[in-house]
Regions:
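Non-globular, low-confidence helical/coil segments that flank catalytic cores
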Residues: 2-291
Length: 291
């Protein structure tokens, strides 16, 4: 004699089963997107957006970890080197977003005065004297050279680095920029180089808004309208944004279109051309502008 399979829901009606299923789904979703567990990192992490004129350089410091992303232009190399050297004598990871002079021109001085353990860069190439000379410096230094691959992660003390881009090959060096999400506990920043709309849209497709979300967003390409598209800015949804550019630069950076996007979204933004060096401090749970 066959036996009927036991109903795991007992004598619940179909409606009761449906209610239980809805409750289970709600609990599952809450577990997936609910509050993050309290951070276990110790100490603080500093995010220094260095005033290098018309260029980019960012120093990230925590106990046991130092990361520098880009080194600004050559005409600010001495001041950039002094700023970084006054805070550390070793760089765990130097990330060079792409081979444009306003991002790598000051790197030679860093190799001359600091110990650099690892260098991350894309396979983008240009035959400019600035870039070829830098490649020689990297080789002479003995630093470990890492090709940037989307999805790769690296650890420097309590700092976690995730490479988001480049995802594909590009003819445009700006779109070849290494985009890095920097995480400290439950806080994060995104450093973008000069990445433009094409790469931004690829990152949305690859990672989705949940993984792109961050607290601090370095506005790409010094605030150019060829970068920072609406969909990417919505995905990143930062609390703070930083624009690194020089007063009276010939490019008109930051472009008005970019400023309007920030203001429409009520994103608090800061500019190195107005404030000089900009520093944020994170305790792993909250990010604040340093006094």
């Amino acid at each position: 004699m066959s036996r009927r399979r036991r109903n795991p829901f007992g004598k619940l009606s179909a409606g009761g089963v449906a209610v239980l299923l809805i409750v289970f789904v709600i609990l599952y979703v809450f577990d997936m997107v609910g509050p993050e567990p309290k951070s276990t990192v110790e100490g603080e992490c500093e995010f220094h957006f260095i005033d290098v004129g018309q260029g980019d350089s960012t120093l990230i410091l925590s106990e046991g970890g130092v990361v520098v992303i880009d080194a600004g232009p050559q005409d600010h190399a001495d001041s950039t080197e002094r700023y970084i050297k006054s805070r550390t004598d070793t760089i765990d990871y130097l990330i060079l977003t792409h081979p444009h002079e306003d991002h790598i021109g000051g790197a030679d001085e860093l190799f001359d005065s600091l110990k650099i353990n690892n260098v991350i860069l894309s396979d983008a190439y240009t035959d400019t004297l600035t870039f070829t000379r830098l490649l020689d410096k990297i080789e002479e230094s003995g630093a470990n050279v890492i090709e940037a691959k989307s999805g790769s992660t690296y650890i420097a003390g309590e700092i976690k680095l995730t490479i988001l881009s480049p995802i594909s090959e590009f003819s445009n060096l700006n779109d070849y920029s290494v985009v890095t999400k920097v995480e400290f506990g439950n806080t994060s920043a995104m450093i973008t180089g000069d990445v433009e709309h094409h790469s931004e849209k690829l990152m949305i497709e690859e990672f989705g808004a949940y993984k792109l979300r961050c607290d601090i967003y370095q506005i790409s390409h010094h605030g150019s309208s060829t970068s920072n598209c609406d969909s990417f800015m919505d995905a990143v949804s930062p609390e703070f944004a930083v624009i690194q550019s020089e007063t009276g630069n010939s490019y008109g950076h930051p472009h008005r279109e970019t400023i309007e996007k920030l203001e429409e979204r009520n994103i608090t933004y800061y500019r190195t051309d107005k404030m000089g060096h900009i520093v944020f401090v994170s305790d792993g749970e909250e990010v604040k502008l340093s006094d």
